[in-house]
């Protein structure tokens, strides 16, 4: 289980096996999109946010913070396991082109029209009223 507390810009994550709660800071309320998913392929969700074309990730096992660019300010993040290997790829849709970073390289693929909206997981803004 996990929650993001906007007033503190802090994540609270409870281990399903031990019940222990871990906290860490990642993201900014109102500006970042929260995109937790299993980016490392270990079967556990990693905390991730997308801000202005930059992904920020905290590995659920190591606690290490990684940041990298794989999109554009006006791109829409659509993380998904596109190659079905058990790891979520960092994908961004922008003006009819998909940009996918698989952990080692960034590839692009033209699919869709400039005004299309990508289908996939819905990113959540960190500024949810009353939560």
Regions found by a protein language model. Give the residues of each.
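Trp/Gly-enriched beta-strand/coil motifs that build multi-repeat beta-propeller-like domains
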Residues: 1-131
């Amino acid at each position: 289980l996990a929650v993001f507390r906007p007033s503190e810009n802090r994540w609270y994550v409870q281990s399903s096996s031990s019940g222990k709660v871990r906290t860490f800071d990642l993201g900014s309320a109102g500006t970042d999109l929260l995109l937790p998913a299993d980016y490392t392929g270990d079967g556990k969700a990693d905390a991730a946010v997308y801000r202005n074309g930059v992904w920020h990730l905290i590995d659920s096992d190591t606690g290490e913070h990684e940041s990298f660019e794989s999109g554009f300010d006006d791109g829409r993040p659509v993380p998904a396991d596109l190659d079905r290997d058990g790891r979520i790829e960092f994908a961004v849709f922008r003006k009819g082109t998909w940009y996918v970073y698989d952990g080692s390289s960034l590839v692009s693929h033209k699919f869709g029209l400039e005004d299309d909206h990508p289908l996939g997981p819905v990113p959540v803004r960190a500024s949810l009223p009353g939560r």
